[in-house]
A protein has these predicted regions:
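Surface-exposed, charge/polar-rich loops and edge strands
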Residues: 1-239
Length: 239
């Protein structure tokens, strides 16, 4: 099969495109391995005994992804919401309330999701769970840069110290209000995610490009092989 310069150019482009697809597939496999390694660490930390939180000065790394228990009183007056949080397709907000574990320290608790027509405002009074509570859940680092719960930004606006982590109550820790008004967040997904299926798709795309280019080159070469004898045949006999 003889290839023209144009054929070689097309083949080179196909190889480059296929190589990019293969690299994307390998990248997805790398992300899969990273996720599995991360999940293994999280699973191991969650299996450790629960930490009893009695101070807001605990380093976040000492409780990150671990089960914790804390007892205190709710400070509803300084409650925050995270807007634009959907739950099963319904607009709403996440409700974060400081739980005062002492007179001069508190930990923000993500009490769950509440429906909100504008995904911003809720009736805070209807979401109260009583004056005091014992909360069991998982600890996560408080997001930096979010002024509503960033401990650094809240340092001068609250009359007490705030922990550098947030508690998300366990799904089994039902709120003391109607479930239609406040729902605990489900447990975080520790599955593999879509990375493996994405990798397979990228590898499949690479195969399709190479196979398709090979078929196209064979077809073009076959067409040229048929056209050349036709041009060599005289249109009429010479007498």
């Amino acid at each position: 099969m003889k290839l023209t310069p144009k054929d070689w150019l097309g083949a080179a482009i196909a190889v480059v495109v296929a190589a990019v697809f293969v690299r994307l597939g390998i990248w997805q496999l790398d992300r899969l391995h990273q996720r599995r390694a991360r999940n293994a660490v999280v699973t191991a930390r969650r299996s450790l005994p629960a930490v009893t939180v009695t101070s807001a000065a605990l380093p976040v790394d000492s409780v990150r992804d671990r089960r914790v228990t804390l007892t205190g009183t709710w400070d509803y007056a300084r409650e925050r919401v995270w807007g634009a949080r959907t739950y099963e397709g319904v607009p709403g907000v996440a409700v974060l309330t400081p739980l005062k574990i002492s007179s001069d320290a508190a930990v923000f608790v993500d009490r769950g999701w509440a429906p909100s027509a504008d995904a911003l405002h809720v009736d805070h009074t209807a979401l109260r769970e009583g004056d005091s509570a014992t909360v069991t859940g998982l600890a996560f680092a408080a997001p930096r840069g979010r002024g509503d719960v960033d401990p650094v930004r809240l340092r001068d606006s609250l009359p007490y110290a705030v922990a550098s982590f947030i508690i998300q109550p366990s799904p089994s820790d039902s709120p003391a209000v109607r479930l239609s008004d406040l729902r605990r967040w489900p447990a975080s997904d520790l599955g593999d995610g879509p990375h493996l299926s994405y990798a397979i798709q990228w590898f499949a795309f690479a195969g399709i490009v190479l196979i398709g280019m090979g078929a196209l080159l064979r077809k073009q070469a076959s067409s040229r092989g048929v056209e050349q004898p036709r041009r060599a045949t005289p249109s009429s006999e010479t007498v």
